[in-house]
Swiss-Prot record:
It comes from the Bacteria. Heterohexadecamer of 8 large chains and 8 small chains. Forms a CsoS2-CsoS1-RuBisCO complex. Keywords: Bacterial microcompartment, Calvin cycle, Carbon dioxide fixation, Carboxysome, Lyase, Magnesium, Metal-binding, Monooxygenase, Oxidoreductase, Photorespiration, Photosynthesis. The active site is at K167, H286. This is Ribulose bisphosphate carboxylase large chain. GO terms for cellular component: carboxysome. It comes from Prochlorococcus marinus (strain MIT 9313). RuBisCO catalyzes two reactions: the carboxylation of D-ribulose 1,5-bisphosphate, the primary event in carbon dioxide fixation, as well as the oxidative fragmentation of the pentose substrate in the photorespiration process. Both reactions occur simultaneously and in competition at the same active site.
Length: 470
């Protein structure tokens, strides 16, 4: 007997609230923080999110009979209170894997954070976490190279990579830009980088910058005997222009390029990561625009989701904040998404904001990049927080040195190596930070001046987006 079509409107929870459902290993799981309109039951709000982010619409439609809705629909299977927040709750939703195109982060986000975020029944909605099933992970390219290969390419072992952003970020001619790159690299840095908003402006066209930077990198390598590099930002107006810039960086024998993955988009990022994998290039990723999306504690997408998506889309390095610098991010939350960038398995741990177990299988890891308002006094804490598989980037903390960028670079290199040596000797580098740095400064006038210059500089502001734990 054929199914009967009943026209009309029915409550979402009749179809999409399934508290008895046990998620499958192949399901994509999502945790949303929901704040519904007054008077709307939690189950209805949660079911509406499940429906509108999967197969549902506001009215029953006859064409449902042409498919197996029970197979394809998203299911809200659990609701939890948010500690310390009486208005909001967590909704856990399971999505069948067949709802998503293989390897497409663009498609996943279009479904999960598409129209549903404008739904009138919701006052606020935030995607807190995603558990990507292994069946989906295996369809993604992931980092073009990964941590191990990047260390081999750069010949850097046993410590974090050391870098800086060229300042001023805008306004320098190509030749002067290259001069600053050279000063930093000869002073002791491993890498320098374009800032996120340097592309190809009237004061400095991209080709000119690439050529002068390549000259600076090669000269610094010859003088120091070390492998050096510069993140050449290939973000562009069109994908075609992006690839043209990447190809030119390769022609110049540069080891690493850069992309602004949120403003550039996941489709462009995945394409560039695939190109890097085929062409033996490292890929540095900047997260410009992330705070517009992730900083509000009740609405948007948490950065841990954006970090997971980047690992799948592809990148060898990703900015993650600093904890101690000028940018938002507490220690435990930051460690939570650093784990998801680098580890092969990350267990559920609410104290770090991880709502699910996440198995990454054999997918390579991503270097965590600490950048933003950091200087030599922060070095012990940065090493303790980020560990060796990171890149520590001091922009103002290099160029702001009274003796210039080369001296600033030397100060940072001495501070880093002193902290690594102390850690390897078993010292508690955060507790003994002052003693470690002052001892090193006895043999480095550059470090001594840097310590004096920035001794009063702190960024002690309370975190806006705090973990929901008691």
């Amino acid at each position: 007997m054929s199914k009967k079509y009943d026209a009309g409107v029915k409550e979402y929870r009749d179809t999409y609230w399934t508290p008895d459902y046990v998620p499958l290993d192949t399901d994509l799981l999502a945790c949303f923080k929901c704040t519904g309109q007054e008077g709307v039951p939690r189950e209805e709000v949660a079911a509406a999110v499940a429906a509108e982010s999967s197969t549902g619409t506001w009215s029953t439609v006859w064409s449902e009979l042409l498919t197996d809705l029970e197979f394809y629909k998203g299911r809200c299977y659990r609701i939890e209170d948010v500690p310390g927040d009486k208005e909001s709750f967590y909704a856990f939703i399971a999505y069948p894997l067949d709802l998503f195109e293989e390897g497409s982060i663009t498609n996943v986000l279009t479904s999960l954070v598409g129209n549903v975020f404008g739904f009138k029944a919701l006052r606020h909605l935030r995607l807190e976490d995603i558990r990507f099933p292994m069946a989906f992970i295996k369809t993604c390219g992931g980092p073009p190279n990964g941590i191990v290969v990047e260390r081999d390419r750069l010949n850097k072992y046993g410590r974090p990579l050391l870098g800086c952003t060229i300042k001023p970020k805008l306004g320098l001619s190509g030749k002067n830009y290259g001069r600053v790159v050279y000063e930093c690299l000869r002073g002791g840095l491993d890498l320098t980088k374009d800032d996120e908003n340097i592309n190809s402006q009237p004061f400095q066209r991209w080709r000119e910058r690439f050529e002068f930077v390549a000259e600076a990198v090669k000269l610094a390598q010859q003088e120091t005997g070390e492998v050096k590099g510069h993140y050449l930002n290939c973000t562009a107006t069109t994908p075609e222009e992006m690839y043209e810039r990447a190809e030119f960086a390769k022609e110049l024998d540069m080891p690493i390029i850069m992309h602004d993955y949120i403003t550039g988009g996941f489709t462009a990022n995945t394409g560039l990561a695939n190109w890097c994998r085929k062409n033996g290039m490292l890929l540095h990723i900047h997260r410009a625009m992330h705070a517009v999306i992730d900083r509000h504690p009740k609405h948007g997408i948490h950065f841990r989701v954006l970090a997971k998506c980047l690992r799948l889309s592809g990148g060898d390095q990703l900015h993650t904040g600093t904890v101690v610098g000028k940018l938002e991010g507490d220690r435990q939350t930051t460690l939570g998404y650093i784990d998801n960038l680098r580890e092969s398995f990350v267990p559920e741990d609410r104290s770090r904001g991880n709502f699910f177990d996440q198995d990454w299988g054999s997918m390579p890891g991503v270097f965590a990049v600490a950048s933003g308002g950091i200087h030599v006094w922060h070095m012990p804490a940065l090493l303790a927080i980020f560990g060796d598989d990171s890149c520590l980037q001091f922009g103002g903390g290099t160029h702001g040195h009274p003796w210039g960028s080369a001296a600033g670079a030397a100060a940072n290199r001495v501070a880093l190596e002193a902290c690594v040596k102390a850690r390897n000797a078993g010292r508690e580098i955060e507790k003994e930070s002052r003693d470690i740095l002052m001892e090193a400064a006895k043999h480095s006038p550059e470090l001594a001046i840097a310590l004096e210059t920035w001794k009063e500089i702190k960024f002690e502001f309370d975190t806006v987006d705090k973990l929901d734990v008691q």
